């Protein structure tokens, strides 16, 4: 069929819609009605359906979303995405200024930006076209989330002609307060779990398998930096360039000539905090001069030229309606405050942490009290105090129950006199929590097995222990309300995938007391296979760096239990293959480094930790077994000895290239 439109008309329509999007989502100035915009978009979609070969990567239709693949490939960042150190007091802030001035020899200009509580991303453009977007991930590698990032209406899909040929921008993806409330209202309507806060909602949206669904949620982006060959010597000027190229930046960045100006601006911004459309938890302070940033360098974890000044947590007043008891995966009873709902830091709070019985007693918290609630780190609500003037008459001090609220078995008090534990191995609460942990994020990461599904399967008698996960059948899942053929297939596929379990994740999933992801990784790197971990002696466990006596004793006791051995053997018989740990190829692997002198871009302890993380060893003295000597300023006698032994000498930059080759 002959087309009613030419390719030139199609491209012109793309440009019109591109301009309409920019005016509405970046300048917040609608230039056409919603109806006219929709008519243009329908026209564009019709042309692209008739001429798919005309479709360009920057077409506004790309924002409408499509289904993405079931996994998000992991890609190395062009430059590490490090975190920013936090400061909570003026004293910590002044320490930062002093360190900067001491290193540079002068007081620099600073740029201030809003610290938006969102998800950090890196977005890459080539020849002016958006080609890839990555999550922050571990700072070295991130997940490819390009399809969902394209749905952000304020983000340009193509850049003006004066933009660099290759450009990477970094920014924060977030939700406005109003949008977040709408999303949670939709979750309640659909009888789905609400998001705890806007940051969690943004993270969950970026991981949606349907970009079309992501597009409906109206994500926002605020750019905070760029990487290109055309960057100027001023960070502030680079931000203004980004703005000129069409990138959104929420809250005008401020340039401060003096420390006094910085402190004044921090106070002014805090006063405007409640008026902002999104959540911020502080202000990021950056040395403005790019060359000065390079001179200040970085540590293994964060940049030395930037600091996040965090405001005091927001506080709300509400009524403590009840104190509930949660039973964790290890049987520990934890008191939780049930509150009259109150809005705090961008989310509705109805429960809060009370930590333990000792903390409740220390603060004299009673049911019926008017309490003060804060968000620790702006995430986890906690009860921080009581308004005694409003205490009702007749309230009684709260005491921990003597029996488990779930199985009614007697509880025992741990030797630390703080932890209270249900020791009944058949307690359903502990069993369900243990299974939830086993399949959750950071463990085996089995998709589609949430709390409600696990509880239902437990109640049906399908699962009682973690190993039962690998016996689940199609018939079992069809008993769960709401599960259809497609859902069943997704769960079974995830379970099958989880059978190929990396050693460190498998150890972490077991839920051994005091063993998290870091300790599990250390065990995997040391022992390399599951059999060796299970047979490790107490002395061998204690010899591993970062594992103390208490953790070592917990690991040994866990693997000496007959129930543990039988459950792991059952998993193996059901097809679970615990993959041996393979150290990544690295020029550090197995090499011994010795450090002498003062390093500028990281502390000695940070350098040593980075070497060990890459599979290297750190020696205290130079010998024939030393592979490299790292030399900083004012090296000692080790430098001379290394020269005599003809040991390779590295400066700090050489070391950084080995540690971070990408």
Curated annotation (Swiss-Prot):
Pfam family, one: DNA_ligase_aden
Listed GO biological process terms: DNA repair; DNA replication
Boundaries of every BRCT domain copy: 583-662
Binding site for Zn(2+): 404, 407, 422, 427
Disulfide bonds: none
Top-level taxon in the UniProt lineage: Bacteria
Gene Ontology CC annotations of this record: cytosol
Protein name per Swiss-Prot or TrEMBL: DNA ligase
Lineage: Bacteria, Pseudomonadati, Chlamydiota, Chlamydiia, Chlamydiales
